[in-house]
Amino acid sequence: MDEGPLTNWNVQIRKGLLELCILNALLPGRQYGYDIVKQLRDIDGLMIGEGTIYPILSRFRTQGQVEATIEESTEGPARKYYRLTPLGKKCLSEMNQAWDRIHLGVLKLRGDAT
């Protein structure tokens, strides 16, 4: 594969997984936006900027998957915290199941499944 197709493939994979990763980052409980970014930056190959997640979080709010609350901070301006709604948890569960099926299928194709 030359650089063009591989680069395009990597971009498409990251776009597809970003929503799944954002929702999974919110599963333990409410998160400040920047904390989500820091968690996602720890995922090798994801490569995201701070501005990347906020439009997605906004769309999740519109769709009812995420709620946001603004809280005063002693460390500067007020912060917006995000958390999953019951609908968001249901969607995440279904997305994780779909990802697990796809991932297992790819592993089987590669001969890596046990």
Regions found by a protein language model. Name each.
Residues 74-96:
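Basic, amphipathic "hinge/linker" alpha-helix immediately C-terminal to the N-terminal HTH DNA-binding motif
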Residues 10-54, 71:
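N-terminal helix-turn-helix DNA-binding core of bacterial DNA-binding proteins
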Residues 1-17, 78, 95, 105:
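Intrinsically disordered, low-complexity serine/threonine- and proline-rich regulatory segments
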Residues 64:
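Glycine-centered, phosphate/nucleic-acid-interacting loop/turn motifs that mediate DNA/RNA or nucleotide
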Residues 3, 90-114:
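Amphipathic alpha-helical dimerization/coiled-coil segments
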Residues 59:
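Alpha-helical DNA-recognition elements
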Residues 68:
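Short beta-strand "wing" residues that participate in macromolecule-binding interfaces
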